[in-house]
Amino acid sequence: MDVKGKTAPVTGGASGLGEATSRRLHAAGANVMIADFNRQNGEALCKQLGARAAFAEVDVTKTETVKAGVDLAVKTFGAVHILVNCAGSGWVGKTVDKQGPHDLDTFKKIIELNLIGTFDCLRWAAFHMQNNQPNEDGERGVIINTASVAAFEPQMGQVAYAASKAAVVGMTLAVTRDLARSGIRCCTIAPGTFDTPLTALMPQPMKDGIIQHIPFPKRFGKADEFARLVQHIVENAFFNGETIRLDAAVRFPPK
């Protein structure tokens, strides 16, 4: 699918990997709907991008804001062709420690944000995508979700995060098969450790400890490297039903 002229909501689109994706798709000619709960950052980015950019205040744990955001993209730009799910968060907490078992409400919140939020966004986007006119390959839409290498090699303390991201990986092929008749593709990217505002807060010794486990290149990923893969998935119609690791071959140990 050609990015130019297509409409792409990006959840978590005002910071980190989502911001890089918003910028790259916009530069490639897409209409970008920055869907984020941070209004200040979202509107500031929208202003920077200028024409073909809009902002929707979306909390992916609240389905009414998800539906409103997708509806706004359709109202503003006429259709939805691409969805990139970047909204999500992590949490550090072991299954049990000396103080007691993992807090169940926290576990549920991470699942609600990373898994249910992802599914809620894609179901509303797909509902609109199925009405698009197909291109020469019969494509009507492309959905790209974000998982994590923690879905495959979670470290200690990542039980909630790993469960949520592994579930995103697990539903990728199921969603793909559900949407195939509608001409909608679905892929997932599982990134390793990337330079984002969150990792910028890490102390340098912690960063060095992570980098020592990365075979090559021995650095954190750049947000635009994630965004470039997003663009390639959109443009390559044979990418479908796959989870792609973007991690410089890292395989993290338990801790």
Model-predicted segments: where are they?
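Canonical Rossmann dinucleotide-binding motif of NAD(H)/NADP(H)-dependent dehydrogenases/reductases
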Residues: 2-33
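Conserved mid-core segment of classical short-chain dehydrogenase/reductases
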Residues: 67, 75, 90-108, 127, ...
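Active-site helix of classical SDR
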Residues: 122, 164, 172
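Alpha-helical segment proximal to the catalytic Tyr-Lys
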Residues: 127, 176-178
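Residue(s) in the substrate-gating loop at a strand-loop-helix junction
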Residues: 148
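Short C-terminal tail/terminal secondary-structure segment
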Residues: 153, 231, 235-255
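A conserved structural motif in NAD(P)-dependent oxidoreductases
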Residues: 215-226
